[in-house]
Amino acid sequence: MGTIFDLKNISYSYVGEITVLKDISFKVDPGEQISIIGSNGSGKSTLLSLLDGLIYPTVGEFYAFDNKIVEEVFDTIKDNEFRSYFRTKVGFLFQNSDVQLFSPTVFEEVAFGPLQLNITPEEVKTRVLEVLEMMELTKLKDRSPHTLSGGEKKKLCIATVLATNPDVLLLDEPTAGLDPRTQLWLTELLQELGSMGKTIIIATHDLELVEQISKRAIVMGEDHRIVVDGDVEKVLNDLNLLLSTNLIHEHMHMHGKLVHEHLHAHDKEHAHEHKN
């Protein structure tokens, strides 16, 4: 398999007026684990939606699996062979779980994707039961998705993505709203999927998750452009970069003659530094 995604000088504007992506260019190769990080409103979720073929560039060119993604071809022609191929290869996790859930039961929710593939009903059932067991959702298979807790809904949404066994996972704020135990479980799952060769791209401002599952970080600035595209360790050790892109912020306090400085991410506990 060649390059998975290739973005060339892409910009995107809502209703042709509000620009949320500016001059975005990068490539994604098979097996990469990438984090797209930036403050709220920097364009992370919009970029993921574009990678999933849900929206199309206002300016520039987007290629997926060496095919140019053009709305007139990708989204409007019935029985589009490449679109079907794309949907089997790429799985998308929405930030808001309720957007992704629509079936009467948990079992039917997970079965929906595999039923669109050319496999037998028996194979669908086997696959669904395996995924439910892996996600620790078997006891909930007859429940309505909308009666589940937030963490259970997130697990279910991940199950619906994994049920079609995609090569590429696009995950929008996957740890948002999860308790610490479920966050740890999800982190370990993503590490395992990465070791299996899955291509994983997440949009997040959870820097701890970025450090644990990614090797490459694409940093979005508040001007909706890519500021840095590079090694995760170098990015996370660059405090000036993290401060300038509003991924961490600092507070200064005086304790007598001691200046007490707090540096912390927006969703994490304070890290402390002292300066005389």
Curated annotation (Swiss-Prot):
Membrane topology label: Peripheral membrane protein
Enzyme class: translocase
One GO BP: transmembrane transport
Alphabetized CDD domains for the sequence: ABC_cobalt_CbiO_domain1
Subcellular location: Cell membrane
Predominant place of localization: membrane
Pfam families: ABC_tran
Keywords: ATP-binding, Cell membrane, Membrane, Nucleotide-binding, Translocase, Transport
Origin: domain of life: Archaea
Gene Ontology molecular function, alphabetical: ATP binding; ATP hydrolysis activity
Residues reported to bind ATP: 38-45
Gene Ontology CC annotations of this record: plasma membrane
Family: Belongs to the ABC transporter superfamily.
The protein's name: Putative ABC transporter ATP-binding protein MA_4021
Organism: Methanosarcina acetivorans (strain ATCC 35395 / DSM 2834 / JCM 12185 / C2A)
Lineage, top ranks: Archaea, Methanobacteriati, Methanobacteriota, Stenosarchaea group, Methanomicrobia
